Amino acid sequence: MQDAENVAAPEAAEQRAEPGPEQAAAEPSPGAEVARPGVQEAAGGEDAEAGPGPEGPAEPAADGEGKADATPGATPPPPEESSAQLAGEAPAEQAQDAAAEAGSEGAGGDPDGAAEDGGADEPSFSDPEDFVDDVSEEELLADVLKDRPQEADGIDSVIVVDNVPQVGPDRLEKLKNVIHKIFSKFGKITNDFYPEEDGRTKGYIFLEYASPAHALDAVKNADGYKLDKQHTFRVNLFTDFDKYMTISDEWDIPEKQPFKDLGNLRYWLEEAECRDQYSVIFESGDRTSIFWNDVKDPVSIEERARWTETYVRWSPKGTYLATFHQRGIALWGGEKFKQIQRFSHQGVQLIDFSPCERYLVTFSPLMDTQDDPQAIIIWDILTGQKKRGFHCESSAHWPIFKWSHDGKFFARMTLDTLSIYETPSMGLLDKKSLKISGIKDFSWSPGGNIIAFWVPEDKDIPARVTLMQLPTRQEIRVRNLFNVVDCKLHWQKNGDYLCVKVDRTPKGTQGVVTNFEIFRMREKQVPVDVVEMKETIIAFAWEPNGSKFAVLHGEAPRISVSFYHVKNNGKIELIKMFDKQQANTIFWSPQGQFVVLAGLRSMNGALAFVDTSDCTVMNIAEHYMASDVEWDPTGRYVVTSVSWWSHKVDNAYWLWTFQGRLLQKNSKDRFCQLLWRPRPPTLLSQDQIKQIKKDLKKYSKIFEQKDRLSQSKASKELVERRRTMMEDFRKYRKMAQELYMEQKNARLELRGGVDTDELDSNVDDWEEETIEFFVTEEIIPLGNQE
């Protein structure tokens, strides 16, 4: 090793040979410290770039330690000692100077002197005469240069705020306090600058944060902040000005994107027999099928293995089928259920669609960081682009974001805060959240941009339910409540009524009393009616298209169901109460009027089919251990099922009519889930629907004929085949009759003018014969004979 160093730097070797070991260890000579790193850089970098090494073979070192490989293009390994000194002692500038000096010495040095020093012929490490050093500093000193100061350091922590009020010296201090209060919540402000002109501020300011991340946070959250009616802040990074100034003045025409034809995504609505579709997951989730609902037997449309890893979900209008995968969500649609879109979200577990089917919300507990929120992501379904990410609190309940009926707004509730966002910007409405101390729950109206929320009691302040109009944030109704334990918000499907179920503990009593506060939303000043019940409430449900609601109350085995009607005069009338019901859930038909009272799971699947027009029980049945009940979108059929997810045996789904008549029993191995495909809202007006109901008798004959055909034992294909055969026979018969009539004259000539086509043409040739049958009559007496 020592010989190799002497060959490369003979002067350094001579200087190190004279001092004693203590001096060499304590304070090396300057020449040695500079020369050795320089030689390292030249040998390791320049020779490698120069290509082939010295001409002719090279002799190995005499002592055997510092062997140099004579292979062309190869460089000797640097000594470990010098490597340590290069990394730990020599600065970048000294290393470059030493490399230059070593290169010049190698090029102009005396090769004979090197041979004498080494005592043998050693390889030459000098560069060729035409060698050009093209190794950049970034390649040689990347680890050192990465820490050098950058020009942008400090600048990318500066933001520019426009639309700031222009004030004089007397109000400048007050303005600074307001600005500091708004922008200091994003991070520590280290410097500010308020440009002035003619004794007044110019309307824009500069703020510097301690960190670029704080500046970026301020831009994201403060841009568009409304200070007052005349001033709305526009916030940008200072570095953005350079970016916008370097934009080319020449406009580049964007490439035209080819239109991707997805086909008719709502083809199933044009089905001739107006049948509905539903999805089925079975074999413990390994297989997924889509069926047409047919009275006789379900008709399979599509079946795939491992289509989803957990479960599936239809979009609100039935356009898309969502499947779950470890890496994200996929949407399918069209006649062949091709993939329409996919969204990458690792470990996704829950999803939610906006009512307009424009946006998709996904949740994953795996991906979330403080700087880049990924727990909840909102996607644009049409483009597949991520719109915004959000953090998720551990105590939140799904759906965390609740959508308005038209998809224009969505909101979330956190501690003492209600945040309302607007689309498509995904930003806060008016750039700020609502501060509502103690807010417990909220819900959107299905019929308008009205939000309802409730706040519990706080010392002497009563609990209250508030109705707020958006986007104006006007409170249209406030209802104060006392002695409140809990509240639940129940909207009627059209938004005509809001029921607030209030559990109270009246003073002087130990039990819990339930009040149903009914808000009549379509009337002036939103009047409220109250129904009080002292029994335990099991379930509550509004009629979807009507003004009735049902309540399950009591305790097993004395459970009752009560049906109420909200009249136009404001009175709430009890229509009917059924005692001794085995039910724990209420399922209204989507069209109203009919309801199924089901005792699911622990109540062994007891079913009661009720017509609320006259409050009669049409049928009582049972589907043992039923876990789910699903109405079809039209309200004609209802499915009860036993899911493998809740019960491991007798997994199947049964199809019933709305009257409670059982049509099918479909058993599937490890059946898991059945979901009807939703239908979009009808395009018909209420007047058109009324006219159709009036003319329904005209179509009844057609419907009855179709019903008879569908109830026939022969399949549809067999009936069609028979109809085709009958039509072919009629055509053949007509053709044969025409040929028969054409040949009549020929027959008359052959038979001497006698028309044998008629039976009475020749009466003389008739022969009459009488045939007698002998009949035996036997009388058998019935009963006892005395």
UniProtKB/Swiss-Prot annotation:
SMART domains: RRM. Keywords: Acetylation, Cytoplasm, Initiation factor, Phosphoprotein, Protein biosynthesis, Repeat, RNA-binding, WD repeat. The keyword Ribosomal protein does not apply. Its main location: cytoplasm. Residues 142-246 are annotated as: Sufficient for interaction with EIF3J. The keyword GTP-binding does not apply. Phosphorylated. Phosphorylation is enhanced upon serum stimulation. SUPFAM superfamilies: RNA-binding domain, RBD, Tricorn protease domain 2. The modification N-acetylmethionine is found at residue 1. Residues 1-130 are annotated as: Disordered. Pfam families: eIF2A (PF08662), RRM_1 (PF00076). It comes from the Eukaryota. It is found in: Cytoplasm; Cytoplasm, Stress granule. Gene3D superfamilies: 3.30.70.330, YVTN repeat-like/Quinoprotein amine dehydrogenase. GO terms for molecular function: RNA binding; translation initiation factor activity; translation initiation factor binding. Residues 157-240 form the RRM domain. Residues 96-385 are annotated as: Sufficient for interaction with EIF3E. One of its GO terms (biological process) is IRES-dependent viral translational initiation. Residues 20-33, 50-73, 81-104 have a biased composition (Low complexity). The modification N6-acetyllysine is found at residues 181, 260, 336. InterPro entries: EIF3B (IPR011400), eIF3B_RRM (IPR034363), Nucleotide-bd_a/b_plait_sf (IPR012677), RBD_domain_sf (IPR035979), RRM_dom (IPR000504), TIF_beta_prop-like (IPR013979), WD40/YVTN_repeat-like_dom_sf (IPR015943). The RRM domain mediates interaction with EIF3J. Component of the eukaryotic translation initiation factor 3 (eIF-3) complex, which is composed of 13 subunits: EIF3A, EIF3B, EIF3C, EIF3D, EIF3E, EIF3F, EIF3G, EIF3H, EIF3I, EIF3J, EIF3K, EIF3L and EIF3M. The eIF-3 complex appears to include 3 stable modules: module A is composed of EIF3A, EIF3B, EIF3G and EIF3I; module B is composed of EIF3F, EIF3H, and EIF3M; and module C is composed of EIF3C, EIF3D, EIF3E, EIF3K and EIF3L. EIF3C of module C binds EIF3B of module A and EIF3H of module B, thereby linking the three modules. EIF3J is a labile subunit that binds to the eIF-3 complex via EIF3B. RNA-binding component of the eukaryotic translation initiation factor 3 (eIF-3) complex, which is required for several steps in the initiation of protein synthesis. The eIF-3 complex associates with the 40S ribosome and facilitates the recruitment of eIF-1, eIF-1A, eIF-2:GTP:methionyl-tRNAi and eIF-5 to form the 43S pre-initiation complex (43S PIC). The eIF-3 complex stimulates mRNA recruitment to the 43S PIC and scanning of the mRNA for AUG recognition. This is Eukaryotic translation initiation factor 3 subunit B.
